[in-house]
Structure formats: structure tokens, C-alpha cells
């Protein structure tokens, strides 16, 4: 969970910040009053191109991390290495290049 939260904070930080402020401001009713902000985080994480790439490229280390957490519920610190591997993988994923940023290559002379 912590690894996923770190990735979410990196790429959907604005949404996460707004949700956190709402929860802090409405301690009695945050579940109801801040639900739409929670949904905006979900929308960001499901649609952000880099997060989609991370989910694909780093599925194996993330699954290993989740499995470690299940096996070590009472001692999640035992999973620090698994989390480090996932975050290391996530950091290596490059954002997709949009067609506008790809430089045109000259055609070879014939």
C-alpha cells in the first residue's frame, strides 16, 4: 500500500492533497463529503499514462510486495526490500513520448 501511495503522490499529488485537506477539514463527515475527491484520485491513477505503464512494467515486483505484506501482516517491515524493488522499477519507467515530442528524422538520401 505504501509503495502504491508513493507512486500516486508523485503523479496525482494535486488530487491527493485536495482529498487530504477535505478529510482534515471534515473529521465527522469526510467519508460522505470527500467521496468525490477520492474518486478524482481513482480517476487520475487509472488514466495517467505513466501509472498505467508502471502497472504493466512493474506488475511482478508489485505482486511480490503485496504477497509479502499478506504473509507478514504483523511485521510489514520485513517487506522493505520488496517495496524498494517496486519503487526502483517504477522510477525506471519512462513517460510515453507523445507524437509532438518525437523529432522528425530526415529521410535517407537516395
Swiss-Prot record:
Motif Cx9C motif 3 positions after renumbering to this chain: 58-68
Keyword field:
Acetylation, Disulfide bond, Mitochondrion
Q: Where are the N-acetylmethionine modifications?
A: 1
Q: Where is this motif: Cx9C motif 4?
A: 79-89
Task: Tell me where it mainly resides.
Answer: mitochondrion
Q: List the protein's name.
A: Coiled-coil-helix-coiled-coil-helix domain-containing protein 5
For the motif Cx9C motif 1, what are the positions?
12-22
- InterPro entries from the UniProt entry: CHCH (IPR010625), CHCH_domain-containing_protein (IPR052848), CX9C (IPR031731)
Presence of the UniProt keyword Acetylation in the record: yes
Q: Which GO terms describe its cellular component?
A: mitochondrial intermembrane space; mitochondrion
- SS bond partners: 12-44, 22-34, 58-89, 68-79
